[in-house]
Amino acid sequence: MSSISNELSVTSSQNVISNSKEQRKKKILFKCALTNTISDVLTNREGWAQTQGDDWQFFWVTREWMTTCYDKHKFSEKQMICHFRNDFELTRKDFLIKNYKKARKAKEKSGIDVVSEFNFLPSSYVLPTEYHLFVEEFRKYPNDTIWIMKPVAGAQGKGIFLFRKLKHVQEWKKKDSSGSEALPYVVQCYVHNPYLVGGKKFDVRIYVLVTSFRPLNAWVHREGFARFSHSRYSTDSVDDAFVHLTNVAVAKTAADYDPERGLKWSLPKLFRFFKSVHGQSKLSKTMNDLTNVIIESLKSVQNLIIQDNHCFELYGYDILFDENLKPWLLEVNASPSLTASSQEDFELKYRILNHMIDVLDIEKKLIGNENEVGGFDLLIKNSKPVELCKVDFHTQPFFGTQFNLRLGDYVEATPMP
């Protein structure tokens, strides 16, 4: 009796294991190296299951993994990861400047008026290598011109400072070059006339998904946000980070910081505000200019980024508008923060990441000729810009396109843990 019972137990266990394997075969297996919103999205996505092995189809990797494991990993046909091997060509500030200047020079040689057609980075130099070129440029500007210094790989506002006098850069240069190569920084002419709302400076975060560089295929999400500085704008003091920087990490250090107080606007809200103040025609031009900034910046690195069909990347574009609504590119982030600062922020990032997975179409639900998926609009297909729908900005949120209901309405976000 005992042996029969044991046999039944073994058979039952084998069936459970077999059924478990069958269930896993039907699911899309993922790994995730982070524990923020992307982890929540993947865990809650229907038909997906987490794995600790190498049988994953989707892996949200870290920058460290790309550095240490990418070259060694043997990808299977269906595996996808969230970074391109040398995305730094676009996302490291010194490389961004170098590639922008190279593309600008090529356009100038071909007879294009770069002042009007290719002019979206402020005057910029990489230090210490371009120090003498910077000094030459510095002396052409009025004495009260403000410049801004940024570490090439910095984030969250760390290491940034503003100055008016050359001696401040000379002091930095002396301090950072103690017998070894100085820490690279970029120096840029500060956009002194930013567009202000309620007397405050702001920049905008736009999410751009690149699924291929050759050919160039890129999508832009209609949602995003404007980040406002903590204090009202003034050029009287260049040392007050609460006035000049819009990073949430900086604002959080203020004694009276309140994440729910309204230091962020949604992009649709911002663009509706622009329209109410400046009219549809002006807003349309700004949208065209903004689209051009994204497209041209991607084209400038199209032939430099290592193309790999296993890779995609969600970039965070940081844009500043001046008082004339001209967009200036501040930087491109390879790892835009996915950690939520509020419930509203969580829901926004949850939607964007869910729509990103829809675009990647790992589940094979799409036909293949879609121009809109979730909140994403196709911006460039096979290296050619896509004509976007023209609708009323008063009712529609971003880039003049309609909501796409092909995959249903926005997925409702789960509560923040």
Curated annotation (Swiss-Prot):
InterPro entries according to UniProt: ATP-grasp, TTL/TTLL_fam
Lineage, highest ranks first: Eukaryota, Metazoa, Ecdysozoa, Nematoda, Chromadorea
Organism: Caenorhabditis elegans
EC code(s) of this entry: 6.-.-.-
Protein name: Probable tubulin polyglutamylase ttll-9
GO CC terms of this entry: ciliary basal body
GO molecular function: ATP binding; metal ion binding; tubulin binding; tubulin-glutamic acid ligase activity
Record keywords: ATP-binding, Ligase, Nucleotide-binding
One family name in Pfam for this protein: TTL
GO biological process: microtubule cytoskeleton organization; protein modification process; reproductive behavior
Gene name of the encoded protein: ttll-9
Tissues/organs with expression: Expressed in head sensory neurons.
